[in-house]
Regions:
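Extracellular/periplasmic catalytic domains that process cell-envelope and extracellular macromolecules
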Residues: 94-96, 121-124, 130-133, 149-150, ...
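Extracytoplasmic ligand-binding site segments that recognize negatively charged/polar headgroups
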Residues: 136-140, 145-234
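Bacterial N-terminal signal peptides that target proteins for export
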Residues: 1-12
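N-terminal segment of the mature folded domain
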Residues: 27, 32-172, 233-235, 242-254
Length: 374
């Protein structure tokens, strides 16, 4: 877990208010469809029932467990399921009309036809991106007790297969005084279509200029693939010398198995992943122009290019993608009730799961978007 996210959450809310752009994974398990206990007092005054389903990013699986418990406690006549199948699968399921919302670590891509497909799925109405789940991405590795610093340039070369040994001269130069083993580096990447992969590739391109591929499918020419966030974390924990990119919460869960998190040099010296360093990076958060204040797409390229001292800009924004209109009456009520519950539970339990609770004007803007869903 990353501790003390309160300052970070406050910064996130402030940045959303001042941004010039205000006018922005495969685990095959469901988070569950059984009803949680409790919430009887709230349920006495609220009549929401029926089945609500979502699918997509595995990065927010733990967050969805928090939200599901709160939602079913408040609305005992509702049923909820979230399948953490990866961002790509979630978008396809949403656009195909088989689920009510999609979780995606990447915004819908117009050049891939996803925006138009979503509009068609929503009965001719726009789909909106609700960035409700925010968390940093860790560079997790397995190298015994060795603490490692890596520059963004070195990181790109590792994942391209240009650096293959832990005692490579480039890594030595960034870790003076550290006894680096002559050990093969095993790159672990997401084999499914993943928004985490999409964002990590955007990050490598923005931060280094030494990365050519893009999209949810990570290149498979180097290393070994694994499905979902938990899959790559498990793989790194089981292979001495392995390295991967994964949401911080999953990396922390594997610390007892020998997994460590690298300090990254974004241009002003090695930075440890912490609530403070994430908060510094969020000072530069901005949103893209989308034509609607309720469609909130983060300008990730600008964020990833940040090299301010003490900042950790490798941050994942997980969107929950919904129809702005076009649901039937029951589904609209369920969607609005669920996401109001999500926004009412940006709390300590969410922090403990490794995420950044949103607050302030950003939270207010999300609430306005949910209220505007028809």
């Amino acid at each position: 877990m990353i501790r003390n996210f309160k300052r970070t959450a406050a910064i996130f809310g402030l940045v959303a208010a001042t941004s010039t752009a205000l006018v922005a994974c495969n685990d095959s398990n469901d988070s569950g469809s059984d009803k949680a206990e409790g919430g009887s007092d709230a349920a006495e005054t609220k009549e929401v029932s029926g089945d609500l389903s979502g699918e997509g990013a595995s990065s927010q699986k733990s967050a969805m467990s928090v939200f599901e418990k709160a939602f079913l406690g408040e609305y005992p006549d509702a049923n909820f399921s979230y399948t953490s199948s990866g961002s790509g699968a979630g978008v396809k399921a949403f656009n195909g009309g088989t689920v009510d919302f999609a979780g995606s670590d990447s915004a819908l891509k117009e050049d891939k036809g996803e925006v138009e497909a979503a509009k068609e799925r929503c009965g001719g109405n726009d789909a909106w991106h609700l960035p409700t789940t925010i968390g940093p991405v860790a560079i997790a590795y397995n190298l015994g007790d060795t603490e490692v610093n890596l520059s963004t340039d070195t990181l790109a070369k590792i994942f391209k297969g240009e650096i293959t040994k832990w005692n490579d001269d480039a890594i030595k130069a960034e870790n003076e005084g550290t006894d680096l083993p002559e050990k093969d580096i095993t790159v672990i990447f997401r084999s499914d279509e993943s928004g985490t992969s999409d964002n990590f590739q955007k990050f490598l391109k923005s931060a280094t200029g030494n990365w050519d591929s893009e999209g949810k499918q990570f290149p498979d020419a180097v290393g070994e693939g694994a499905n979902g966030s938990s899959g790559v974390a498990d793989q790194v924990a089981s292979i001495d010398g392995a390295i991967t990119y994964v949401e911080a919460g999953y990396a922390h869960q594997k610390e007892a198995d020998g997994v460590k998190i690298a300090k990254i040099d974004f241009g002003n010296g090695p930075v440890e992943l912490s609530s403070e360093s994430v908060g510094v990076a969020l000072d530069h958060l901005a949103f893209k122009e989308t034509g609607s204040e309720h469609n909130m797409v983060v300008d990730s390229e600008k964020l990833f290019a940040s090299d301010d001292e003490g900042a950790y800009p490798l941050i994942l924004t997980t969107y929950n993608i919904v129809c702005s209109a076009g649901y039937d009456e029951e589904t609209s009520a369920l969607v609005k009730a669920f996401f109001n519950t999500v926004l009412d539970n940006q709390n300590q339990e969410l922090e403990d799961a490794g995420f950044i609770p949103v607050s302030g004007d950003h939270l207010d803007r999300l609430k306005a978007a949910v209220e505007a869903i028809q």
